[in-house]
UniProtKB/Swiss-Prot annotation:
Source domain of life: Bacteria
Gene3D superfamilies hit by this protein: Ribosomal protein S7 domain
Gene this protein is translated from: rpsG
Cellular component, GO, one term: small ribosomal subunit
Function: One of the primary rRNA binding proteins, it binds directly to 16S rRNA where it nucleates assembly of the head domain of the 30S subunit. Is located at the subunit interface close to the decoding center, probably blocks exit of the E-site tRNA.
Protein name: Small ribosomal subunit protein uS7
Amino acid sequence: MPRKGPAPKRPVVADPVYGAPIVSQLVNKILLDGKKGLAEKIVYDALAGVAAKNGQDAVVTLKKALDNVRPALEVRSRRVGGSTYQVPIEVKPHRANTLALRWLTTYAKSRREKTMTERLTNEILDASNGLGAAVKRREDTHKMAESNKAFAHYRW
C-alpha cells in the first residue's frame, strides 16, 4: 500500500466546445480504444441532436438527464457472522455522478437505433423526461436500497 496517502483528485478540464466539465466526462465515458476524436464527434453530434429535437440548450438538457439518473442510495454487500447482507448506503456526489454517466452510456449502447449518435441522443432525451433504461436502473437501485432498509444499522 502507498505510504503517501491517497492521490489528490485532479480537476476535470472543461471541453472546448461547450465549456462544461460534464461534457468532457461524457466524452471520456464514450471513449473506446483511445479514439478520442471519434468519441468527441459522437458526443457533440448527439448534443446537437438533443438541441435540435428539444429546442433547449443541450448542456442544460444533459444536466437534467443526469439529475434524473443520479442515484441517492445504493446497496453494498457486508458480511456479518457467516451471512451476507445488502446494506443500503448513501452515494457520495462524485460516485453518483460517475454512476449516472456510466449508466447513461451503457444503456445508450444497448439501444436499438442505428448509430451511436442517435442512441445517445435518444437516451439523453428519455432520461431528461424521466424515461429510459438509465432512469429505470436508478429506480431499481433505490427500490433495492428501500427493501433492505432493515440492514441499515450494519453501515460502516
